[in-house]
């Protein structure tokens, strides 16, 4: 969920504070990115039907980790770099977001399954992403954009760890 705010709220703040690009033009690119995210959500459903939700999420964590390496050069790379950051980031977001909540359903007994998954998803959103824009802006302002890369990388690693734990805790009905 950290990726969500790192391609939506954080870059708007960063552009407003540290770049000369008009925020309005950046918002147009974000709207295009939102379309890519929506297509990614649909594609993730198709992919997950073939290989499973956890496998889909686990397969997407390494590309998100790789993407994190390029955060500084893309955000600080002028209009082309920033647009690439948004479009690639939203695509990865859509592909992973589509399966995030559903991947936890197997951890709950049948009659608690969807309530448990909803609560887990909401809490993950709050803990994993609620402060992401503020943390990313603070890191970039005080230490440089490279620390935003480390932040996103830590989220990808945490995803892989959580998926591993999720598999071990799966409840079979």
What are the residue ranges of the model-derived segments?
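Interfacial helix-cap and linker-helix signal at transmembrane-aqueous boundaries
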Residues: 16, 47-48, 135-143
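C-terminal ends and interior cores of transmembrane alpha-helices
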Residues: 62-77
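Multi-pass alpha-helical transporter architecture, strongest
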Residues: 153-173
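Intracellular juxtamembrane helix-capping segments at the cytosolic ends
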Residues: 96-108
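Cytoplasmic membrane-interface "Motif A"-like loop-to-helix N-cap segments
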Residues: 50-61
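A late C-terminal transmembrane helix in Major Facilitator Superfamily
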Residues: 111-140
């Amino acid at each position: 969920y950290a990726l969500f705010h790192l391609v939506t709220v954080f870059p708007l703040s960063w552009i407003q504070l540290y770049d000369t690009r008009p925020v309005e033009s950046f918002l147009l690119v974000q709207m295009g990115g939102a379309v890519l995210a929506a297509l990614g959500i649909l594609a993730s459903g198709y992919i997950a039907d073939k290989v499973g939700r956890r496998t889909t999420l686990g397969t997407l964590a390494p590309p998100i980790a790789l993407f994190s390496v390029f955060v500084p050069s893309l955000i600080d790379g002028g209009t082309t770099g920033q647009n690439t950051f948004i479009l690639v980031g939203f695509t990865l977001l859509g592909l992973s977001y589509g399966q995030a909540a559903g991947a936890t359903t197997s951890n709950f007994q049948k009659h608690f399954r969807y309530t448990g998954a909803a609560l887990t998803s909401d809490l993950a959103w709050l803990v994993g992403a609620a402060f992401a824009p503020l943390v990313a802006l603070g890191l970039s302002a005080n230490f440089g954009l490279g620390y935003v890369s480390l932040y996103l990388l830590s989220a990808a690693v945490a995803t892989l760890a959580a998926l591993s734990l999720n598999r071990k805790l799966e409840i079979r009905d």
